[in-house]
Structure formats: structure tokens, C-alpha cells
């Protein structure tokens, strides 16, 4: 369905840029304040009826009021021209509609003015009169576009209660009004969604599920777009990413000019590693909002992960043109070049980012530049850049600069020196404000000891880490203690993991801990099954170690053909330094690339990767014996 959607979009003839219109709250010019609720109703009904109109993106009030926290609260019941105009501009409106209405002698009349906010010129005037707000609002919408969708209810009491909910000052009043709206028209979808969201925010998941289930039972009487929104809401509540994507795809087909839908769909595709589909979704978003810098940035990463590096660079250069004073475009360009193996280009871009803003990502671009040089095999050159990073941290009085030095020693192949430096740091930090860093350091030392083959030392270090652990270091300490337990069968490791991590909220950390334990025990077959499951639910950006570890287990179990694509991209270095579990994937990825190249009959490529692996491993081999095998294969 996803590809059919894009095929349909592609067949449409090119037209003018999409009009992004914000319909503001109307002003009541009539004599009765009891009619004030219609001001919001006009905005909501017209916006909803224009939602699927060709060439138009009608900006919902919920999006307009999203920036309230940054721009300050607005009196939501005030006329839109005074209270919402700046919000419309902040939401990217290229046209702003405002209006007034009055009820006299039982007849409702209204006028809508649409203007270009850049010039202040009026581009359209519309007026209508009828017996109720639905008829008048629909006529105004039809004068804006001849393709409008029917609103979700014809019940005035339901609409009035829903508008009261939208403008209520308290959660209790909002919920009461939403209940009234549902009671007045049980086939009116939006009140169900808003009420379910409030229940979920209050951690009342059962009530939220019941509301959405009730709404979906009646969804056959609702507009298709509303059904899709309800399905998406229910899928998100249940954590069903496949169903959420299906609902988003349906909604994108019904309302193809809504950038929020395309953004959510692109994010869904990214999380599912459907990168080409994410590229298409970001492009559709940019058709509506061509100056959306965040979308251009994300398009760059999506295209890079899809293997379309020229597309990635083009998107990021557009991003850079929009944000020339910022460091992030340079950092993103560095990431994309690093993914593609253009390591010197990546290094240069990271250095440019660090120069433009030394504080960006806590100074992490110098570290990334050092890693880019290291990945090229130039350890001495990488050391020079790493010293710049550490000196900058020392100048800024970073209390954990010594920790960073130890991490660099490890990742650049000085493993014994790294252990000595980090243990010295941990001992000095045990009794002061850096106690949690000491805990993490001992956990790191436990992992390093395990991969160097000293399980007894690892158990002692893990115990020290556990005794010092606090909220931010407890997870690492638990995993380190788990891994330092005596060797066992895969089934026994599973039992231990269930015992240590019994709660559903701990499933992720439990599964990763079990993977590391199985890899330490060379139990590659059960590890591959668990890694495949983890890899299926994570994007490459979320955890670059997963494809490398999965490729490792597949190579060890005779699936070299499946492993090769997983090793295509370089992992983007973290600005936070070396991962606690980096020994499981770096520099191992070069050894694995060497194995793949050897099996593919590419001896030169295999030798180059084996050499780089040996160079970055240093003189101290890890327990798996790959350094010796790489030396023998060269």
C-alpha cells in the first residue's frame, strides 16, 4: 500500500507550492455571549473540512497552540486575529484566515477573510448565512476549495461540548466536556481520541484502551481519516508499530498535504529500518514545508542508511544553507561521509563543526574527528586530535577528563594502559561527588577484564561498581555483575537473566545483557536468534552495535551471505565517548569485513581489513582469538 500511495502521488501533475493556511478563531459580533463557543467551532470545522483539499494544508489548532510554552500562554477564547496570529506564523502558515460572525433573529451569518501574512494583502473573501454553524462553516470552506470533506458530526450539542473541552482551563473540565460530546454523538471520533490521550497521560492505560475500543466499534460511521487516526492512536498505545504504520499510510493517502502525518510516517519507517520509504516520506513532507530544517536533516540520514549518499549530501547542503551559523549541519555531513567510508571528509567536517561551535554536543565533534582518523588506521594522527579534545575538556575543568583519556587508550589499542588509567580514576572518585562515575568506571573495567579473559578480576570490579551505584549507573552495574557470573549454558544464562531482570520494563536491558553473556561464552547460535529479534526492532541510528554483532553471529554460524550487508556502513561515533560494550563490535567490524571479503574471493580487501583490525586491537588480544586468526590470514 505504501508504494501504491507514492505511485499515486507521482502521477499527479506538478502544481503550485502547497498553501499552508491557518484558520483562526472567529470573533463574535453578535449581542449574546452564549454564542461565543462558535468562534472556535468555525475554526475547527473549516480546518477539518479542508484537511484533504488538494493544494492546501489546513493547520490544526492543536499544532498552532503547540508552541504556547515557548511563546507564552494565549487567551484561547479570545478572537484569533489577536490571540493566534503569531502562533499561525510560528506554525509556518503562508495564509491566515480570520473571521467574524453574528446571530440575529435566529439566523447565523459569518465572513472569512484570508490574507497573505507577508504582504498583508487580502487574497480571498467569503461569506455565508444559514441556520446553524455547520451549514455556514461548510459554505465558507467550499468557497476556499471545491473539494471539502464532511465534518465528523452534525450534532450541535456534541460540537458545543467538544469546543468547550478544547477551551477548558482544567483537565477535569476538559474530561467532563468530552464525556458530554461523546454522549451527544457516539459516532463523533475526536472526543474519544482526546479523552484517551488524557487517560494515557494519567497512566490509566485500561481506560484509554477501553475508550479507543469503543470508538473503533463505531468507526464505520466515521469519516475515513478519523478511523485512521483512531487506529493509529490504538496502535501506538499497544506499541504495535506495524499497525501504526498502516494507519499512517492510510491517513497520508487521505490527507496528503499534512506534514505531521508524513513526519510520523517517516519516523515509523526509520524505526523499522525501511529507509527508502522514509526518504519518500521526508520528501513528501518537504513538498509541504520546503524550509523544514529538521526534515532535511533527517532526510540526509535516511538517504545515507538507504545507500543514496548523493541524495543525503544534497539534503544536508540544503539544511546547511538554511542554518549557516549552526554546527549541526556540518556534524550531520560528517556523519553521512563517515557512514559512506569517506573518513577524511568526515574528519574535516567534524573539525569544522567543532570550530564553528566548540560547545556543540558538549564538544563531541573533536572526539568524532579523532574517531574518523582512527578508523582510517592513522593512530598517531588520531592521537593528536584526541589530545585536542581532552585538552579542551581539561581547560573547561571537566572532572572526568581522565575517564575520557582511559576510553581513548582502550579504543586506540592500548588496552592494558586503559585499564590502569581507568582504575586510578575510579579509586580517586569513590568518595566524592564523582561516586557514580567511579561506579561506571568499575563496571567498564569489569567488562574489559571479561573480554581480556580475567573473569575473577571482573567479578571483583563489578562488585565495586554495584556498591557505588546510583540512579544513573545502576543499569551498567547490574549488567556488569550479571556478565561476571560463572560460565553457564545458554538456558542457564536465560534463567539468570529472568531472575535479575523480572520486570517487563527491563526487557531491553535484560536482552542485551543476555546477548553479551552468550557472546562471551561463544554461544553464537542462541545469541543470533536474540540479536535478530533486537535488530528487527531498532534503527541503525539507535544502536550501531546491533548489525555488527548480528553479522558476527551469522558468520560464526555459516551465514556469511546474510552477514555482508550488515557490515556495509561504518558506525557513527557517539559524542559521549566509548560505549561500555564497545569491545563487542569495535574494532571487530574490520575483522568481520575481512572474513566476508575472504569468503567472497577478495584477498586484497580481506588483508586490508585484517591489518586494520590488528592495528586497532593493539598488543593485547581478546578472548575470542580473532587477532591471531587475522595475523595468520594476512
Regions found by a protein language model. Name each.
Residues 166, 197, 233, 267, ...:
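Residue-level recognition of tetratricopeptide repeat
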Residues 179, 183-184, 216-221, 249-255, ...:
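Solenoid-like repeat scaffolds
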Residues 194, 201, 237, 271-272, ...:
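Register position in tetratricopeptide repeats
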Residues 44-57, 62-176, 222:
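Catalytic-center loop of serine/cysteine hydrolases
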Residues 158, 189-190, 223-225, 259-260, ...:
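Helix-start (N-cap) detector for alpha-helical repeat units in TPR-like alpha-solenoids
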Residues 156-184, 194, 227-250, 254-260, ...:
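Alpha-helical segment of the N-proximal tetratricopeptide repeat
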